[in-house]
Amino acid sequence: MLKREIEIGKEQGLKSKTAALFVQKASLYKSSILVGKGERKANGKSMLGLLSLVIEKGETITLIIDGFDEDRAMKELEDFLSS
């Protein structure tokens, strides 16, 4: 299991278009992907879950990935969120 704190670099945060791209990327992996903000967590492969967290640019989220392809998933998703 990998767990990382990531500062959101996307100008619009994780709103509809960016959240959809994140879900699309996350869905390519077999690993379990959770996104946490404060005390709340959401399935990283769920558009509604991500949108419910209301993630803005500059906020720090926790990305938790568990599975056999967790290393590749963490690298790609961390790069996506922080750019």
Predicted ranges, named:
Residues 51-83:
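C-terminal structural segments of small proteins and small subunits
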Residues 7-43, 48, 52-53, 68:
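Compact, glycine-rich, soluble single-domain proteins
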